[in-house]
Amino acid sequence: MTKYLLAVSGGVDSMVLLDMVATNYHGFRGKYLSGAQFPADFIVAHYDHGIRGKVSAEDAEFVRQQCRNYGVAVRCGYGKLAAATGEAVARQYRYDFFRRVAEAIARDDPVYLATAHHQDDLLETIALNIVRGTGWRGLAPMNQPRVLRPLLDIAKAELVSYAIEHGLAWREDQTNDSPRYLRNRLRALLASRSPSNKAELIRLYERQKHLRRQIERELEHYCARHIARDKQGQLVLRRYDLIMLPSQVAIELLRYVTDGYLTSPQLQQLLLFAKVGRPGKQMLWKRVGVRLDTKLLYCRLSDLAIYK
């Protein structure tokens, strides 16, 4: 039986998601969540980073109380991150917690994470990726397997209107207004743009999403022909193929083999290693291990996560 993990921070977006799931708003569960039963098939997950001290603890208690009101189980995680912790690090801790909860409840059942990312979040992420010099994948973000984003077509203003109309309570995160974070500065910039500008970004996203699906489908076909799995469960591919392929194609192949766990610089490093590394040498990351012999590259994934 499929289980669903709802990421709920206590903010307006996630409280709307929780309410839509609980009330099956306009057939919401049937449309996005395979008709799952509430609350039996759901667990709420909340992570308190500890960044905002007492306020963070109050957010966690708020989420627990709301879950009691809805009659749904909740798992809370706690961190002790410094106030100066960056968004990327905080996100990693949060998703590591979601992964641990998913593994704890999975048994033999698939578990999907549902988040409250909305259209404004999507636009901000695309803009952020462009500013950081993204590759083509950064123009079609939010595409992880087993992560559902049912609110992605809805603007933030519509979610706020829903919350007010349905009398929902929520918590405000004051750090969302801080100019210290690049995402917040880009949010203010995007807010000043015309609807037509935003529509162009959405159209760019849709085109890139379609292209991404085509590329990944071709990768799957290539890998089915050229990659094997040995008795130890390691993925095996020929070093010769990586040497002969164009570099960007080889990088995409390695990204596929390593299940998206490595960053672009790490993939560049791995490609060089595959081309010139000596037999018997290894490279190890948190969830990826690679070993070379004379002709082959062996890749083992450990601590398999469903979220990246």
PLM segments and residue spans:
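AMP-forming adenylation/ATP pyrophosphatase catalytic core
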Residues: M1-D13, Y25, I43, Y47, ...
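Core alpha/beta nucleotide-donor-binding catalytic domains of modification enzymes
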Residues: M1-L189
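Hydrophobic residues within well-ordered, non-membrane alpha-helices that form the packing/core
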Residues: V21, C67, A102, S194, ...
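Residue-level recognition of alpha-helical structural elements
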Residues: G86, N197-E200, I215
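Amphipathic alpha-helical interaction segments
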Residues: Y181, R185, R203, E252-L253
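Conserved anion/nucleotide-ligand pocket segment
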Residues: R187-L204
